[in-house]
Design a protein with these regions (language model features):
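The feature marks proteins involved in alpha-glucan
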Residues: 15-49, 83-157, 186, 194, ...
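Tryptophan-paired
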Residues: 63-98, 170-201
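Extracellular beta-sheet repeat scaffolds used for adhesion and glycan interaction
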Residues: 76-80, 113, 119, 181, ...
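Non-catalytic beta-sheet/beta-sandwich ligand-binding modules that flank or precede catalytic cores
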Residues: 87-97, 191-199, 205, 252-295
Length: 295
């Protein structure tokens, strides 16, 4: 069985970072610019406060794998070189010319793998940052507290006036006076944004984007409901213009990957995916290829 091809949808309208003085927008104006061909890895917390004792060991689609810089474990890049930001610390890593995946781990001078093997999927040529939380979970955006979800809304025209969100599902304090939704914060990293408090063990959310300058059904920017059902794994959602898809990354890529397969019978295979909210069963069947390993 071969893995599915990543179902990718890119756009020239991928949002650029919007600078802001609002700390809730999760930006850090003091950071140095990211060089072309480089990805910045932000770490929320390191396994030790002694940064000089820790190293970042990298392989796969990097310009120079750590194994070419020196033997294990000394070929790793020392965290003594890491710089501070609002999230924690960060290191920049040069990528290969056509990167798809950066694999890494954090080790120490004794050669202990402290983080386990981790990977950053390079979702888009524009992707130049990734965030790693204290449990070494990797994100394509800066994660927010687990009891909230952030909806990011990108408009090509940049007009966020009178725009709001009407939401329901596993949320707290849902709006109830239609069509008076909750207003977006206009100056986020990826356009406008809204942080929504969630109920305990929240799984799903539904929402509508509203233009409160209009009346009747015209108040709905997109006529159909947006729905998402994997809040346990996802901290931020991304929508744009009148696109009907809810994306889980700021590059508007349908990041659906096969994570496991088990043959249940001669005619039946059970497949596991990263998520299915961004794709239809027809898309899966179209992209899926099953091959005989002996042929």
């Amino acid at each position: 069985l071969t893995e599915t091809t990543k179902l990718t949808e890119t756009s020239e309208n991928t949002p650029k970072t919007v600078s802001t003085n609002n700390s809730q927008a999760l930006t850090n104006a003091s950071e140095e610019p990211i060089a072309e061909g480089t990805i910045r890895l932000h770490f929320q917390e390191l396994p030790s406060q002694d940064k000089a004792s820790l190293g970042l060991w990298t392989w796969d689609d990097v310009e120079t794998p750590s194994s070419q810089k020196g033997a294990w474990p000394t070929g790793a890049t020392s965290f003594a070189e890491a710089k501070q930001d609002d999230y924690g610390v960060y290191l920049d890593v040069k990528l290969s010319s056509t990167p798809k995946k950066l694999s890494f781990l954090i080790n120490n001078a004794a050669g202990t793998n402290l983080s386990g093997d981790k990977a950053v999927e390079i979702l888009s040529p524009q992707m130049n940052e990734a965030w790693i939380d204290k449990d070494f979970q990797v994100y394509s955006y800066q994660p927010i507290p687990q009891d909230h979800v952030r909806i990011n809304y990108f408009r090509t025209d940049g007009d966020y006036g009178n725009k709001s969100v009407w939401y329901w599902g596993d949320v707290k304090d849902a709006p109830s006076n239609w069509p008076d939704g909750v207003n977006f914060q206009p100056n986020g990293k990826y356009g406008a944004y809204l942080d929504i408090p969630l109920t305990e063990a929240a799984k799903s959310i539904g929402f509508l984007l509203l233009d409160e300058s209009k009346t009747g059904d015209d108040v709905k920017i997109q006529a159909n409901d947006y729905k998402f059902s994997d809040l346990k794994k996802t901290r931020q959602l991304f929508v744009r213009d009148t696109d009907t898809t809810v994306y889980t990354n700021p590059y508007f890529v349908k990041d659906v990957r096969l994570t496991g397969a088990q043959q249940l019978s001669p005619s039946k295979i059970e497949l596991s995916f990263t998520n299915l909210d961004e794709v239809s069963s027809e898309d899966i069947l179209k992209e899926l290829k099953v091959t005989d390993k002996d042929r």
